[in-house]
């Protein structure tokens, strides 16, 4: 009996640890390098504020949604989603939202990488913005 108790105590934390790492493997990451279209520089800050506010209020599955500027005409956008469903919800919201036309009028997408395992359905929805989908092959996170 003691052996069974010992083994159950030994393996229970391992099973939780495995489950925890699996959930992290479900994350989907979007990496976008954007160029501000000439003549649109004055609307960038307001547009970014509106986009951030909208995503923060309406997309609980978004873990990170951050803009970085290297100059007044180059922006990097970093997005992390809990899982495929959250990423697809974001894409649907963006494509159907009021801010999408302003976004494409303001930014030229130079590169757009999608990291994580995505479905064919999501790839089809994103085809006008990117076809660069990269499933994880190996690695770890602490």
Where are the regions a protein language model picked out?
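Short S/T/G/P-rich N-terminal loop/turn motif that feeds into the first structured element of a domain
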Residues: 16-75, 82-92, 105-142
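Amphipathic alpha-helical coiled-coil segments
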Residues: 98-103
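Hydrophobic h-region of N-terminal signal peptides that target proteins for export
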Residues: 8-16
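Positively charged n-region of N-terminal signal peptides that target proteins for export
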Residues: 1-4
């Amino acid at each position: 009996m003691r052996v069974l108790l010992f083994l159950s105590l030994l393996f229970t934390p391992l099973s939780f640890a495995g489950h925890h790492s699996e959930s992290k493997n479900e994350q989907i990451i979007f990496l976008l390098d954007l160029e501000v279209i000439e003549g649109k520089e004055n609307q960038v800050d307001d547009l970014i504020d509106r986009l951030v506010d909208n995503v923060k209020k309406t997309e609980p599955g978004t873990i990170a949604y951050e803009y970085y500027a290297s100059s007044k005409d180059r922006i990097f956008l970093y997005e992390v989603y809990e899982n495929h469903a959250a990423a697809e919800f974001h894409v649907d919201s963006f494509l159907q939202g009021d801010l999408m036309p302003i976004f494409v009028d303001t930014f030229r997408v130079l590169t757009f990488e999608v990291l994580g395992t995505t479905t064919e359905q999501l790839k089809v929805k994103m085809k006008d913005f990117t076809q660069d989908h990269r499933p994880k092959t190996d690695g770890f996170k602490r």
